[in-house]
Amino acid sequence: MPSFDVVNKVEMQELDNAVNNVKKEVDTRYDFRNSVTEIELHRGDKRIHLLAGDEMKMRALQDMLQSHCIRRKVDPKCLEFKDIEPTSKGQVKRDVVIQEGITKDVAQKIVKKIKDSKLKVQAAIQDDQVRVTGKKIDDLQEVIQLLRGEEFGVPLQFVNMKA
């Protein structure tokens, strides 16, 4: 039976490239001169650490990160910005968590949406992905179009299309 998987994966190399591009832009921008500004990608625990001189620079850094992610085809919805925290040196820091995988709640919403569509397909939650199977590839393509039209709060990719 034809099937495909609905997943949420982040291309870490592209995210690394986006972070490096932000670092280069910070080095060349006039408003970041003579201020401490850091951006680091921690691949192991899937987070980005931001450090800036004040909240205005932090917002600018956040905007740059989001725009560079868009340029590198990384969906900024996978970035969860935590609260801005002051440091002891009068600066501000912020952690950005990189969300990968589909949570149980989102997976249940996806399955419910597929079942409500009355298409002849089955959806099953498997760890951090949703497997959709059906008899016809056309039905599976309709499901893909249906899910692309909805907003689930996480970017969705459709992989492993097997006929």
UniProtKB/Swiss-Prot annotation:
The keyword Nucleotide-binding applies. Signal peptide: none annotated. Keywords: Nucleotide-binding. GO terms for cellular component: cytosol. The keyword Nucleotide-binding applies. It comes from the Bacteria. GO terms for molecular function: nucleotide binding. Belongs to the YajQ family. Nucleotide-binding protein. This is Nucleotide-binding protein DvMF_3058. It comes from Nitratidesulfovibrio vulgaris (strain DSM 19637 / Miyazaki F).
